[in-house]
From Swiss-Prot:
Family: Belongs to the TACO1 family.
GO BP: regulation of DNA-templated transcription
Keyword flag Chaperone: no
Single GO molecular function: DNA binding
SUPFAM superfamilies given in the database record: YebC-like (SSF75625)
Keyword annotations from UniProtKB, A to Z: Cytoplasm, DNA-binding, Transcription, Transcription regulation
GO CC terms, sorted: cytosol
Subcellular location(s) per record: Cytoplasm
Main location group: cytoplasm
Organism name: Crocosphaera subtropica (strain ATCC 51142 / BH68)
InterPro entries noted in UniProt: Integrase-like_N (IPR017856), TACO1_YebC-like_2nd/3rd_dom (IPR048300), TACO1_YebC_N (IPR049083), Transcrip_reg_TACO1-like (IPR002876), Transcrip_reg_TACO1-like_dom3 (IPR026564), YebC-like (IPR029072)
Protein name: Probable transcriptional regulatory protein cce_0894
C-alpha cells in the first residue's frame, strides 16, 4: 500500500496549490451526481453520496451547487437530460506499470478517444477491460490528520476492524491512512470519529497487490507525465497505478 499512498499524498500537496480549481469542482460535482443516481438522494442513507458531499464541501463547493448535483443525479433537476455513467478503463505505462482509470462521462466515445490519445502521447497503451484490474484490490481508506497517538490509533483501528494503517509526516503535521474492507468503511469512519480522531477523507481506493519499482529517471518522468495527462481530462475522476520509486526521484519528477 505504501507506494500508492505516497503518490496519493504528493498529489494531495500539489492540489493545495493547483490552479485547476474548475476541474476539481467539475469532478466532485459529477461524483455527487453518480452517487445520487445509484442510490437514494439522501446522504443519511447513501454512504457514497455522503462521502462525495463531504469531499465537495472540503473543496469549497457552494451548497447550491451540491444540491443541484444531487437533483441532477436524482432526475429532479429541470431542463437537464445529461446522463453520466461510471466507467473503468485500464492500460499500461512505460516499464509495464499498470494503470486503472475511473471516469464519469456522458460520452463513452469521447472519453475513450481522449484516454487513448493521452496514453499514445506518453509511451503507454490503453488496454482491454480486465487487463490490469486483477492486479489491484479495492479497499476502504479513512484519512486522519492532527496529533495522533499511535497506541490510541491502534486500539481504534482494531475496534473498527481495520486491516492496517500507515503514519505520515506532512509539512510538520501528522497524518495517517487506515485501511479496511469496502463494506466496513462506514463503520471504521464512524469509529475513528467517535474516538475523536480528525477524519478528513473517506474513500474507496484501488490498492496494488504488487509494486513495480522504477529507478530510471526517464521512465519515472514518463509515467508521471502520463498520469498527469490522464488526470487533466475532464471525465477522469481517479487514476491508480502500481509503481514505486524512491522519494527523491518522485519529488524530483513531480517538480520538473
Amino acid at each position: 500500500m505504501a507506494g500508492h499512498s505516497k503518490w496519493a499524498n504528493i498529489k494531495r500537496q500539489k492540489e493545495r496549490v493547483d490552479a485547476k480549481k474548475g476541474k476539481t469542482f467539475a469532478q466532485l460535482s459529477r461524483a455527487i451526481i453518480v452517487a445520487a443516481k445509484h442510490g437514494i438522494p439522501d446522504p443519511a442513507g447513501n454512504f457514497q453520496l455522503r462521502t462525495a458531499i463531504e469531499k465537495a464541501k472540503a473543496a469549497g463547493i457552494p451548497n447550491d451547487n451540491i444540491e443541484r448535483a444531487i437533483a441532477k443525479g436524482a432526475g429532479t433537476y429541470e431542463n437537464d437530460d445529461t446522463v453520466y455513467e461510471e466507467i473503468r478503463y485500464e492500460g499500461y505505462g512505460v516499464g509495464g506499470v499498470a494503470i486503472l482509470i475511473e471516469a464519469f462521462t456522458d460520452n463513452r466515445n469521447r472519453t475513450a478517444a481522449d484516454l487513448r490519445s493521452a496514453f499514445n502521447k506518453n509511451g503507454g497503451n490503453l488496454g482491454e477491460t480486465g487487463c490490469v484490474s486483477w492486479m489491484f484490490e479495492q479497499k476502504g481508506v479513512v484519512r486522519i490528520e492532527g496529533n495522533i497517538d499511535e497506541n490510541a490509533l491502534l486500539e481504534a483501528s482494531m475496534e473498527g476492524e481495520a486491516d492496517s494503517y500507515e503514519l505520515y509526516e506532512e509539512d510538520d503535521d501528522q497524518a495517517a491512512e487506515v485501511f479496511t474492507e469496502m463494506t466496513n468503511l462506514d463503520t471504521l469512519s464512524q469509529t475513528l470519529n467517535d474516538k475523536n480522531f480528525n477524519v478528513t477523507e473517506v474513500e474507496l481506493r484501488w490498492i496494488p497487490n504488487n509494486l513495480i519499482y522504477i529507478e530510471n529517471d526517464e521512465q519515472a518522468k514518463s509515467i508521471i507525465k502520463l498520469i498527469e495527462a490522464l488526470e487533466s481530462l475532464d471525465d477522469v475522476q481517479n487514476v491508480t497505478t502500481n509503481f514505486e520509486m524512491a522519494d527523491e526521484l518522485m519529488l524530483l519528477t513531480v517538480e520538473s
